[in-house]
Design a protein with these regions (language model features):
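Short, solvent-exposed loop/turn positions at domain surfaces
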Residues: 36, 48-51, 57, 73
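A short, N-terminal "cap"/entry segment at the start of jelly-roll beta-barrel domains
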Residues: 1-35, 43-44, 50, 118-123
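Structural motif
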Residues: 60, 67-69, 76, 92, ...
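Ligand-binding loop in jelly-roll beta-barrel domains
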Residues: 33, 89-115
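Histidine-centered active-site/metal-ligand motif
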Residues: 51-55, 59, 93, 105
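Short, conserved beta-strand element in jelly-roll/cupin
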Residues: 39-42, 54-70
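Short acidic-glycine-tyrosine-enriched beta hairpin
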Residues: 74-89
Length: 123
């Protein structure tokens, strides 16, 4: 197992302004046993592919760059760098980038999502 992992910020910078990128940092393929971690770049105007959704696991975002708008159970929040957002399992939510620059965040999912089930479900 690789104990130290790095976000490839160079790949994020080289990607197109309108391109969404997900970099797996910890997943089934890399030996995850308790959670998954992805670094995600969301372009301006982009966001939750499923719209308002929920998950069977807790989802935690840590914002690295930009400002992400979050809606949780009907209440909206603007979250900038250093913000930690917690979506408990089963709670309706969505996220999107309402700003003009891309956002970059870490997404933690715990416990380990079932690979045989869809991760997001529209609600």
């Amino acid at each position: 197992m690789e104990y130290v992992r790095h976000v490839d910020f160079g790949a994020i910078e080289r990607s197109g302004a309108d391109e969404r990128i997900t970099q797996p940092l910890l997943d089934y393929a890399s030996g995850a046993q308790s959670c998954t971690i992805n670094c995600i770049k969301t372009p301006a105007g982009g966001g939750s592919p499923a719209g308002m959704d929920g998950h069977d696991v807790d989802q935690i975002f840590y914002i690295l760059r930009g400002t992400m708008r979050i809606e949780i159970e009907g209440k909206e929040y603007d979250c900038g760098p250093g913000s930690l957002i917690v979506f408990p399992a089963g709670v309706r939510h969505r996220n999107w980038n309402a700003a003009s620059e891309p956002t970059v965040h870490l997404a933690f999912n715990t416990p380990l999502p079932d690979p045989n089930k869809p991760f997001a479900r529209s609600v």
